[in-house]
Amino acid sequence: MSADRIIAIFAIILAVGFDFVNGFHDTANAVATVIYTKSLKPGVAIVMAGLLNFLGALLVGTAVAQVITKIIPADAVTLPIVVAVLLAALIWNLITWWFGIPVSSSHCLIASLFGAGVAAAGFKGVEWGELRYVILGLLISPVVGFIGGAVMTWAALKLSGEAKREDQKAPPQLMRWLHIIASASVSFSHGSNDGQKTMGLITLILATHFAEYGYTVSIVPPWVMALAASAMALGTIIGGWRVIRTVGTKISRERLSHSQGFGASMSTALIILAASHLGAPISTTHTLSSAVAGGTLSAHGRDKLNPSTLKLLALAWILTIPVAATLAAVSYYALKLFWHA
């Protein structure tokens, strides 16, 4: 087996590692609200999230994966680019996880693709039509999440009659079960969108370095779908408690109510599922964090939002693109020093 083939296999392992980290970094997206409202015990919530992440990644088509494979032109893809992209995304994901900052794995990946593509071939190394489509989705989803969280929370409070007087130790059973269903839907939708990003990267590696076996960028092999789904599910079950605490307790100064948790989770699930069907790789992290903020505003007013946490989230959102792109570019140049390609 040639050195390039061995390194290509290593790149696939890195992609699976990214999916695993994505799972435990983004566990908070699915289970933070349902844990901190005491609707489910933490262990039950995390196992549920892992199983539904697996099913979402496996069952909801590959439209997002197809978009990921097209951000860098197929004839320009080299192993140094792919390895640089994965290293940059992994490093930034792990740094932010360590500090409990809920950043977007999607932002990491898209920015890394941009940075490595430009480093390798200048601005011709990126398909700008595809990139504009992706960036639009990443920009719009937090805004829609904020509005959706506010509207859903308002509706849930009105329909349930709970207002602001919920008993956190004994949640109303109807709202509790609706919240659990909404949380399960976030897990499923997260798998459907984020799992496809790794599928796209692995398919890109296979199409460019194992083409004689019939692999192309237009078809995601079933074994790749199963591998990506399994890695994300395992990462989700292991969990990322640092991020869970931030989403569950620090965005709002008031403890999350059951109606608020339902509103944030259900609006996030609907937005992510719609994006998955449209092939838009958007951020579950930013969508849900915005929905929690919108729900807090709707339920308790502006004074109950935690400005320091919101500023930290905004800073991480702003920094992720330049930092991940720079990490990918630096990684690419470093790899090229030791690469014959």
Question: Which ranges hold each PLM region?
Answer:
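Multi-pass alpha-helical transmembrane bundle typical of ion/small-solute transporters
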Residues: 1-341
